[in-house]
Amino acid sequence: LDYKAKVKKKVQKRVFQELIALANAHDKPMILHCRYSHARAHQMVKDAGVKQAVFHWYSGPIDLVPEIAASGYYMSACPALIYNPYHIEAIRAVPLSSLLLETDCPVTYQTLESRPVHVRLTLEKAAEARGETLEEIAAATTANARRCFGI
């Protein structure tokens, strides 16, 4: 749900409900792109019984983080940690058991054109922001990814 986009919310909600049904029918995790809609998206996937969901590039309300985590869902950090103070604060609030790392490529972050290799940069910036070691973040996010994606 991207409430910054020009597509009507009603249309987005209908399509989102169809995607939720598809994910549930095939027992697949959902990757959620949310802008100005985190609480609504969370409520919709939770109400529909979605088992696994990732709130990609989490930049939603910090006070929503505990609810998302309590639902068993994940929130991901991305290379925006190099410049976005709000993303840094949000990622600090995410419990380690709910954190994933990503690159969101091919996106350009200021002057950095994101590539898969930049997951290491995301790891480093997440560790720095959270005051945890690279090893702690890497071990936890790897375990989280395995749980979320069944790998």
Language-model features: locations:
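Divalent metal-binding pocket/active-site signature
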Residues: 1-71, 89, 108-116, 132-135, ...
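Short secondary-structure boundary segments
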Residues: 57, 79-81, 103-105
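Active-site glycine- and acidic-residue-rich loops that bind
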Residues: 74-87
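Active-site micro-motifs of SAM-dependent methyltransferase domains
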Residues: 75, 107, 147
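Short amphipathic alpha-helices and their capping/turn segments at secondary-structure boundaries
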Residues: 86-96
